[in-house]
Amino acid sequence: MDPVNFIKTYAPRGSIIFINYAMSLTSHLNPSIEKHVGIYYGTLLSEHLVVESTYRKGVRIVPLDRFFEGYLSAKVYMLENIQVMKIAADMSLTLLGIPYGFGHDRMYCFKLVAECYKNAGIDTSSKRILGKDIFLSQNFTDDNRWIKIYDSNNLTFWQIDYLKG
């Protein structure tokens, strides 16, 4: 199953979606293992949506299909607490329009996810890089509170039984 259909079928609101693209303006400067992340907002007017922060557009909401245009690989993670995930998804909308960057009043993709979950009561550790606290994909994927439910590089990994309860 491709990641878009998997997310539409199984992923709860607030799931975090890591993707790698064939071409990225920032991939060579990014020490993160996974190069981009977004929060699955869920559906609105029958459209599946993702909130992300990009170099050119800052924090924005895009259709799930567009989020995956040109992707090479994808992973989807969730928490056990679905209510917390819904709060984080709702929080993501309050950050729309913030410009991209690493300053106090700026937002890059991993910081977006960390901020949304911080406001939902889930703190994320950061890495100290060049005197700044920076969030990377590893801060989520190495945290055992996050459960990987999809990996496009390991399609036998799906934890659909976990999602069904």
UniProtKB/Swiss-Prot annotation:
Q: Tell me where it resides.
A: Virion; Host cytoplasm
Tell me, in a sentence or two, what this protein's role is: Contributes to virulence in host but not to replication in cell culture.
User: What is the similarity comment for this entry?
Assistant: Belongs to the orthopoxvirus OPG091 family.
Which keywords does UniProt give here?
Answer: Host cytoplasm, Late protein, Virion
Organism annotation: Monkeypox virus
Q: What is this protein called?
A: Protein OPG091
| Any one GO cellular component localisation term in the record | host cell cytoplasm
- Known InterPro entries for this protein? Papain-like_cys_pep_sf, Peptidase_C92
Comment field (misc): Displays sequence similarity with a group of bacterial permuted NlpC/P60 proteins. Thus, the ancestor of the OPG091 gene might have been acquired from a bacterial source at the onset of poxvirus evolution.
